[in-house]
Amino acid sequence: MAIITREKEQLLMERAGKAYDQAIQLLKMMDKAVQDLAFKNDPENRYDTWITLARFDNILQMILLHMAVSDGGISPRERKFIQQIVKYGDLLDYLRQQDKEEDGLTWDKLAKMNASKQAMVVQLLTPRLERLCDAFVKPLAILDGMVKDEDFLKLLLGNVSAICACMSYMDGVSSKKEANACYDIGYQLLEGRWKKYMK
């Protein structure tokens, strides 16, 4: 593992933060458009956009976790990045709420596991996001399919890729395994189902 300076770490966090903010602005705009269409005659059924943004945060953290375990264990800098990049939702908090377990998996517990156990846990957690991913993707993908002069999926994936690229250097070196993990899990959770719902 190579060493990165605090200045480099800060620069990576700033770049990732800009990409994250762009993704959030895009999602806010899309969510408003979806709700304007869906609840035009039923304004009382509108929901807080925070729900959509929290779902995105959970999906993003899962993508980043897959990257972190792809080339070994989750480094302290990777953990910090994964926890600090999001503003609306936390994956492990969400899973504990789903389980109704106060003493479920936490970031501290995950950090104390060895690399192989971390990888196993991340693999086991992924299927538990199926419903959340569908709830996040479906309305946005349908909107994307209706708007012919803009490719919202491409814009969102561009921001996610930029965040992943920054995270890949947090342990000092960017590996092909991390890039592949980002693409594979990103396709599974976002891109593949988005394209399915756009049809």
Located regions from the model:
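Small-residue-enriched hydrophobic alpha-helices in membranes
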Residues: 2-69, 73-199
